[in-house]
């Protein structure tokens, strides 16, 4: 049995398309952070079992959704993601097949402002999203939460679709907020001088995305993403150097990012 686990906060613009893309699943669980735009009601109408809980952080919120499922297999999705037909078929075939894998990485087709970004490290962007409930759990960390799996992992062939930022303004706003959380997890800064981190890492980020990973092939959007990721890297280390973390209120910043 497959259970889909989703967390939401004011996702009325996304939740219907997301849930319709997984309507074939035996169970859909949504943990909602008291949305004010009708997200919870929409999810209920579309057949999801909805729970409303206060914000606990990305990983804890996702683990809460997983814990409320009853299926043997979990498909963890974000509200701005969709499961196309070919991936649906592959998932259905995979979970009834008796193989050695306890979980599967799924590639993501990331769309930015309506364009599929094929380069710059944005594709295939593998994420472990399908896993056996008894073997996986989200690692509790401030940002970039991922599934920790006790067992071997495989890869699915077909990608899911991820409709990321709606506009340049939306992207910049989220990057500004997200940098506060990312500054919490910079082990490299303990081994690298902050001056080097502030200068070399942003430059490397740009060169890596735009040249080494061929971001230039995505045109103006590829250039924008490389420049903005370099700025995000600078901002992350700058906030760390300014010891801005205490005043950043990371839990509140996470809540804003989830909205």
Predicted regions and their residues:
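A conserved acidic beta->alpha catalytic loop
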Residues: 21, 32-44, 78
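Conserved donor nucleotide-binding strand/loop of the catalytic core
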Residues: 40-68
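Cell-envelope/extracellular polymer assembly enzymes that use nucleotide-activated donors
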Residues: 1-3
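Acidic helix N-cap motif at the loop->helix transition within catalytic regions
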Residues: 16, 37-46, 86-87
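Catalytic-site signature of metal-activated, phosphate-bearing donor transferases
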Residues: 63-66, 72-73, 77, 84-246
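Short, structured coil segments at secondary-structure junctions
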Residues: 24, 46-47, 126, 149
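Short, well-formed alpha-helical segments that are part of the catalytic scaffolds
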Residues: 6-24
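Intrinsic disorder/low-complexity segments
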Residues: 247-259
